[in-house]
Amino acid sequence: MRLLCGSQNVQKMWDMSLEIILNGDYIMEYDYMPQLREADENGYIGIRGYLNFFQDAATRHMHDFGKGNDTIPEQYGICWMYTKYRMHLVEETGFEHPVTINTWIEKMKTTAVTHQAIEITCNGKQAATGRLESCLVDMKAGHLTKPSCIDFPENAAVDRQLQLEPFTRLPKNADGTDEVYRYVIRYTDTDKNRHMTNLRYVNLLMDAFDGAFYEDRI
């Protein structure tokens, strides 16, 4: 099912799309024209752009269910927290064609975390695939909670698994790592959860490595 947003009949489209979403097997799809701000140092859309697309798609997907971070903190005292990203970059893209982004929730045995799969294509060719892991956090108690606590649709997951390596279990401390630089968090870095917004982590991650690192791998 393909849903495109426009300026006309917005309420009618929303009512129709919400009915489709709540019926299950919902795969969100939309087109986006890349912008200069999303380009890497070489001028093409690559790591930075795709990771930002992943975040945009994942949050927009939750908004489609009516369960985005714009509303659930006030309604339930709960927020989404994205904890892991994995991306496979197939090829970089330019600015001549829009990218098509598909997002869906993968079926899992556990409800403690949610996995959103994302596929990006450009001009009919696969550009990147990825998976985002998120969890729901009770903002007052500070512990994890389940999707049922925000009345999330039980049939939201799609029986379609992305062919991508599983997440790596990360260490709980910084032993064996080197400090490369420090960053002071300011007001514009924070989000509704009073934590650093995920949008900032993309640049922080990329700046942890020098230019030679990327030249050898891209």
Task: List the model feature ranges, each with a label.
Residues 86-123, 218:
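Hydrophobic beta-sheet segments that form the core/acyl-binding groove
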Residues 38-40, 93, 109, 124, ...:
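Residues that cap or initiate secondary-structure elements
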Residues 14-82, 129-131, 138-217:
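Hot-dog-fold acyl-thioester-processing enzymes
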Residues 119-121, 126, 133-139:
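Hydrophobic, ordered structural segments
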Residues 8-12:
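Charged/polar low-complexity intrinsically disordered segments
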